[in-house]
From Swiss-Prot:
<feature type="binding site">
    <location>
        <position position="84"/>
    </location>
    <ligand>
        <name>L-aspartate</name>
    </ligand>
</feature>
<dbReference type="InterPro" id="IPR006130">
    <property type="entry name" value="Asp/Orn_carbamoylTrfase"/>
</dbReference>
<dbReference type="GO" id="GO:0006207">
    <property type="term" value="P:'de novo' pyrimidine nucleobase biosynthetic process"/>
</dbReference>
<dbReference type="GO" id="GO:0044205">
    <property type="term" value="P:'de novo' UMP biosynthetic process"/>
</dbReference>
<dbReference type="InterPro" id="IPR006131">
    <property type="entry name" value="Asp_carbamoyltransf_Asp/Orn-bd"/>
</dbReference>
<feature type="binding site">
    <location>
        <position position="106"/>
    </location>
    <ligand>
        <name>carbamoyl phosphate</name>
    </ligand>
</feature>
<dbReference type="InterPro" id="IPR006132">
    <property type="entry name" value="Asp/Orn_carbamoyltranf_P-bd"/>
</dbReference>
<dbReference type="InterPro" id="IPR036901">
    <property type="entry name" value="Asp/Orn_carbamoylTrfase_sf"/>
</dbReference>
<comment type="function">
    <text>Catalyzes the condensation of carbamoyl phosphate and aspartate to form carbamoyl aspartate and inorganic phosphate, the committed step in the de novo pyrimidine nucleotide biosynthesis pathway.</text>
</comment>
<dbReference type="Pfam" id="PF00185">
    <property type="entry name" value="OTCace"/>
</dbReference>
<dbReference type="GO" id="GO:0004070">
    <property type="term" value="F:aspartate carbamoyltransferase activity"/>
</dbReference>
<comment type="pathway">
    <text>Pyrimidine metabolism; UMP biosynthesis via de novo pathway; (S)-dihydroorotate from bicarbonate: step 2/3.</text>
</comment>
<keyword id="KW-0808">Transferase</keyword>
<protein>
    <recommendedName>
        <fullName>Aspartate carbamoyltransferase catalytic subunit</fullName>
        <ecNumber>2.1.3.2</ecNumber>
    </recommendedName>
</protein>
<feature type="binding site">
    <location>
        <position position="136"/>
    </location>
    <ligand>
        <name>carbamoyl phosphate</name>
    </ligand>
</feature>
<dbReference type="InterPro" id="IPR002082">
    <property type="entry name" value="Asp_carbamoyltransf"/>
</dbReference>
<feature type="binding site">
    <location>
        <position position="139"/>
    </location>
    <ligand>
        <name>carbamoyl phosphate</name>
    </ligand>
</feature>
Length: 305
C-alpha cells in the first residue's frame, strides 16, 4: 500500500487498523515531516470537540488541519448545548447535518464512538482523540513514528512501558500494536495499577530489572484526575520506586530512547532535568504528532471520496 493511498472511513482504535495501514500512516507522516504537500480543490470542514482538557492532542490536530488547508469549525464545550443536556450523539448528529466532514473527539466515556460510527444517519467521519482510559490511536501512531524513525523497525525491539498502566489509554493502544508489529514488551509500575490484561501482551517486571536492556523506555503520566495516587504514594516515593532517576538514566543503553506521552509530572515519572536529556525523544514525539495527524486527516478525507 502506497503511503498516500490509504483511505479510512473513521479512525477510532488501533485494533481497526491492519499492520499495512499502520505502516502507511507512519511513512506518510514521515513524508509530511520531510516536506510533502497536499492541495485540495474542494472545501473540507473539520471540527475538534474536546470534552476533556488537552494541549498536545488538540493543538497538534489543529496545526495538522491548518497545514492541510482544512477549514476549522470552532467548538467550545462550555458555550455549547452540551450545557443544556445535549447528548454527544445529538451534538455529532448536528455536525453531520451541517456538513462537517470530520469530527475529532476526545471524551471521558470509554467507547463513546461506537454509536456514532454505527449510526446510519451520521455521515461525518470520526477520529478518536482519546476515550477515557480506552484508546488513543493518534498518540500511538506518533509514538510508532518516533520509534520507527529511530530504529527503522519494530521486530525484535525491547520496549518497556512504565507507570499508571490501568488508567492509560496510551498503554492500551501501544501494547496491542507493538506486540502485533513484533516488539517484545515489558510492563512496570505499581501493582495496584496493572491489571491482568497486560499479561497477554508482555511480562510484568520492575524498572530496575530491564532498564539496562530495553531499546525504548516509555513512561506514563500518573493520572491523578482518575484516582487519588497520593493516598498510596508520596511524589518522592513514587519517583524513587517507579520513576526515571539519574541513576536509572545512566544505566540505559547508549542507543536507547526515553519516551513519554506528556504532560510530564516532573520529578514524579521523570526527573525534571532528564525530560530534555540526550536520550529523550519527548519533544520529538510532540513534533511528530503534527505530521502523523496530517496523515490521519488525509486518510479519513480520502475515505470520504
Amino acid at each position: 500500500m502506497s503511503s498516500n493511498q490509504i483511505a479510512l472511513k473513521n479512525l477510532v482504535s488501533m485494533e481497526t487498523l491492519s499492520n499495512e495501514e499502520v505502516m502507511a500512516l507512519i511513512k506518510r507522516g514521515i513524508e509530511f515531516k520531510n516536506g510533502a504537500k497536499v492541495h485540495y480543490d474542494e472545501q473540507h470542514i473539520v471540527s475538534n470537540l474536546f470534552f476533556e482538557p488537552s494541549t498536545r492532542t488538540h493543538k497538534a490536530f489543529e496545526v495538522a488541519e491548518l497545514k492541510l488547508g482544512c477549514d476549522l469549525l470552532d467548538f467550545d464545550v462550555k458555550t455549547s448545548s452540551v450545557n443544556k443536556g445535549e447528548t454527544l450523539y445529538d451534538t455529532i448528529l448536528t455536525m453531520s447535518a451541517l456538513g462537517v466532514d470530520v469530527c475529532v473527539i476526545r471524551h471521558p466515556e470509554v467507547d463513546y464512538y461506537k454509536e456514532l460510527v454505527e449510526s446510519p444517519t451520521i455521515t461525518t467521519s470520526i477520529v478518536n482523540g482519546g476515550d477515557g482510559s480506552g484508546q488513543h490511536p493518534s498518540q500511538s501512531l506518533l509514538d510508532l513514528m518516533t520509534i520507527y524513525q529511530e530504529f527503522g523497525r519494530f521486530e525484535g525491539l525491547k520496549v518497556a512501558i512504565a507507570g499508571d498502566l490501568d488508567h492509560s489509554r496510551v498503554a492500551k493502544s501501544n501494547m496491542q500494536i507493538l506486540k502485533r508489529l513484533g516488539a517484545e514488551l515489558y510492563f512496570a509500575g505499581p501493582e495496584e495499577w496493572r491489571s491482568q490484561e497486560f499479561a497477554d501482551y508482555g511480562k510484568f517486571v520492575t524498572i530496575d530489572e530491564v532498564i539496562e536492556e530495553v531499546d525504548v523506555m516509555m513512561f506514563l503520566r500518573v493520572q491523578h484526575e482518575r484516582h487519588d495516587y497520593e493516598s498510596i504514594f508520596s511524589k518522592e516515593n513514587y519517583h524513587r520506586l517507579h520513576g526515571l532517576t539519574q541513576e536509572r538514566y545512566d544505566r540505559m543503553k547508549d542507543t536507547a530512547i526515553l519516551m513519554h506521552p506528556a504532560p510530564v509530572n516532573r520529578d514524579v515519572e521523570i526527573a525534571d532535568h532528564l525530560v530534555e536529556a540526550p536520550k529523550s525523544r519527548i519533544v520529538e514525539q510532540m513534533t511528530n504528532g503534527v505530521f502523523v495527524r496530517m496523515a490521519i486527516i488525509e486518510a479519513v478525507l480520502k475515505g470520504r471520496q
